């Protein structure tokens, strides 16, 4: 074989090593756009002009140098043979082309976005009427409705926030008394629930004490206060039976018990249940009518 052919084969071999190195660098995520040699670019250009797949394998580069379809040993090469190495090389070149085209598209898209951003920044801070006029007169709004519409909506939102921060305090001044009244009512209801829980707790304690024969404890009224000093303490069922009608009504009103004006003996029974005297001896005790005056 002539010396020139050996030199061509050696050049092809070195070029193949460069391609393998570029493929390894591509797998590692490194830049490989400058690793393709001049001979490979020539092969790609001719293949694209003929609308044929690019063959950057060792054999394809050898055919480009010698213009003969031969392999490394000078034997005739079957062009229909789909070598996996050739397929990988073509895929590698195609990925490079897509990468370069995507970079170009990315730069152009970035420039377009920056241009739209500058245009949005130049928009005047105005009301919705001015914003609608800008939308109608802007030729890019029909092409890019979502971006510009979101930007203008954001402008209106900022203006609304400014209005709320500056105008809302003055407009809310008339509502302050009603808000304070609502807060006061809430606190009062909270206190009432707390007093009701305290009364129920003392009532439960009396039920346990009376079941074991102990006297009852004083149960606070529904408003949280204790019975007045002029009222007798209710320790046993006899204390309830000795109450006058006025005293019994005072206790019943303090505990928030609904009554009927015609009730007589039932008032004492309701008071007995309200303070927790539910033992067997208490329930079986027969109460008398009201005394005309408190016992001395």
From Swiss-Prot:
This is Meiotically up-regulated gene 2 protein. GO terms for cellular component: cytosol; nucleus. The lineage of its organism: Eukaryota, Fungi, Dikarya, Ascomycota, Taphrinomycotina. Keywords: Cytoplasm, Meiosis, Nucleus. It is found in: Cytoplasm; Nucleus. Coiled coil: none annotated. The keyword Cell membrane does not apply. GO terms for biological process: meiotic cell cycle. Belongs to the UPF0612 family. Pfam families: Mug135_C (PF08593). InterPro entries: Mug135-like_C. The gene is mug2. It comes from the Eukaryota. It comes from Schizosaccharomyces pombe (strain 972 / ATCC 24843) (Fission yeast). Has a role in meiosis.
